Amino acid sequence: MIPLVSVITPCYNGANYIAACIESVLAQTLVNWEMLIVDDCSTDNSAEIILSYVKKDTRIRFFQTNKPSGSPAIPRNIAIDNAKGHYFAFLDCDDLWLPRKLEEQYSYAEANNYLFVYSNYEKITSEGIRNERVITVKSQAKYSDILKSGEIPCLTAFLHRSCVGKLRFVPAPKEDYVFWLLILKQAIVAYNTNTTLALYRDSLASRSSDKVAMLKNQWKIVRHLERVNFFYSLYCMAIYSLKGLRKYIR
């Protein structure tokens, strides 16, 4: 029997999208999953929508934060702490999976004895319209690789719970990137299935309007958090900037 997969979904004011997000999980061809949705004190009717699905499918579990955290990190950590699965997968409330996402990634990981896999993804409009804007990422990612690129799309990550252990998301800018660094620092390598398995909603709200702030955050992580030497940090930043430019013009 295929081991249980825990789907981790933070939600904040996602009433316009959360139903479609849940439906994309319900449509998975791999059916042995649990979906842990953690509402971060939404002020819209997100919780009401989520609870309507909880009543219909016992695989969906609902949690709430005690107070607004202002970051997906805390809701994700709550979900991880309560997860029962052998594998973890991450899906934000405004994104979607294609139906074979979990099955393909599980099969790929098992066939190759990989602990951590990810995939390419397609950008869609805020209204959910697909326009073939596929983002292809590197075929594998080591710690040294993502210092320069950060390219492990959170909505496509699929990893064995042994990778996570006691590690948790840090409430800070680029919290998913810092989490991948912590995991890959354990000499773990992540591998791309080289297929497109998820849909990323490319809305104005999801784009950073301050590219300078993004670069500053990247520098803080590489230079100060990871304590990479000054000149190699500059090299990493140059590569990161070039890759970021290519990403935002696609």
Per-segment meaning from a language model:
Residues P3-S6, S24, E34, V178:
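Cell-envelope/extracellular polymer assembly enzymes that use nucleotide-activated donors
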Residues V5-Y17, C21, Q28, V38:
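A conserved hydrophobic helix/loop-capping motif in glycosyltransferases and polysaccharide synthases
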Residues Y17-A19, D44-S52, L96, R100:
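Acidic helix N-cap motif at the loop->helix transition within catalytic regions
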Residues S24, D39-E48, K67-S69, D92:
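A conserved acidic beta->alpha catalytic loop
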Residues T65-A83:
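Glycine-rich, basic loop-to-helix element that forms the pyrophosphate-binding segment
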Residues D81, V137-A213:
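Conserved nucleotide-sugar donor-binding catalytic segment
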Residues F88:
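Short aromatic/hydrophobic "clamp" motif used to bind/position activated sugar donors
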Residues R100-N131:
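Conserved donor NDP-sugar-binding/catalytic core segment of glycosyltransferases
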